Amino acid sequence: MKKMIDLFAGCGGLSLGMEQAGFSVVFANEINSSLFETYLYNRNLPKNSYFIGDINDLNNNIDKYKELFIDIDLVCGGPPCQGFSMANRQRILDDPRNNLYKAYLFFLKEIQPKFFIMENVKGMANKINEILENFQEFLGKDYSYSYSLLNAKDFGLPQNRERFFIIGNKLGVNTDNIFNNIRNVAIKKRFVLKDAIFDLPKLKPNNVKNNPKIENSDIGFFEIKYKYPYSEYANFINNGKKINKLYNHKNRYNNDRDIEIFGLLPQGANSLHKSIEHIMPYKNRNHIFKDKYFKLNENEVCKTITSHMKFDCNMYIHPNQPRGLSPREAARIQTFPDDYIFKGTPNNWYAQIGNAVPVKLAELIGKEIIKYL
């Protein structure tokens, strides 16, 4: 197995995809302990093989882990960055908001992996020339780099999710070829939303407040035995593995007005639709309420799953049930397998899932990189 390190690991979507591609995680870092609870629950990492805390603290104590960091094949990371807009004229490295980005570069410099991946929002493309200069400043001329915007839907996955990737290596590999190979992968099927979620049990609206621990057949369960009907999509995300339990498929609370709106809106409609104008008479305030509600279309890919779902799922209304998507449905869209279990509170599940890299997109990237190792 090829050795990889995952920084800013979150709940483990990127790691899982790389593991499915043939990499083995030898070390992971995440500052958010609730996110990392899920990461650790789903894999067996020895205690000295992870660090829960700020990457800057990891860098300050890097000698403690040096034995683990020998001959690393791949380092992955998506450092949170807020200074990538065109409007920001400050140098990236001088912007205090980007200290985690700087820490990621420092880690690469210290570890010198054969390959690295940096993944981030598409706004990173606005500063790509400066970013590549930063890489050269930290890593010297031993590394070559390529970059690309990749959208999950272009690879047959049921989500419109565009992210920016930089791949670098010190083996002399032309990374342009890696991105070309990724883009030219033969797509066996292009999945849409109904493929991803329609085989899961139906849930009824939940209008009872303050009941996050309650579970039943109406609003769903944290964990329950379940016999899945055959689904080509489930077979795809589960890699053919048969799973006999359903996890994290639980409906959240909504007030009666929301539930009524969920039922009235047709698929593909938002808050401006005439079907709810008697409930939301805001014709002169369209710019405020346009993005308040949206009912997903079963025959299209899903809009981008985001961590905002931890607050509400009003922009992610199920196509034919008067409710928002459940965490398991969101995880399905992010191509997590059905036996990947999310820990913490239901709201926290949404945050974990929304911040993840789609597992099958990560696997696709990993399979191309591992060919050169």
Place the predicted regions along the sequence by residue.
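Class I S-adenosyl-L-methionine
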Residues: 64-69, 82, 86-281
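C-terminal target-recognition/interaction regions appended to catalytic cores
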Residues: 222-373
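Short clusters of hydrophobic/aromatic residues that line enzyme substrate/ligand-binding pockets
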Residues: 58, 84, 157, 181, ...
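Short Gly/aromatic-enriched secondary-structure transition segments
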Residues: 42, 181-186, 319-323
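A generic secondary-structure signal marking the coil-to-beta-strand transition
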Residues: 71-73, 162-164, 189, 193, ...
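Core alpha/beta nucleotide-donor-binding catalytic domains of modification enzymes
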Residues: 2-112, 122-126, 133
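Short alpha-helical segments and helix-capping/turn motifs at coil-helix boundaries
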Residues: 55, 60-63, 149-153, 288-291
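Hydrophobic alpha-helical packing residues
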Residues: 18, 139-140, 369
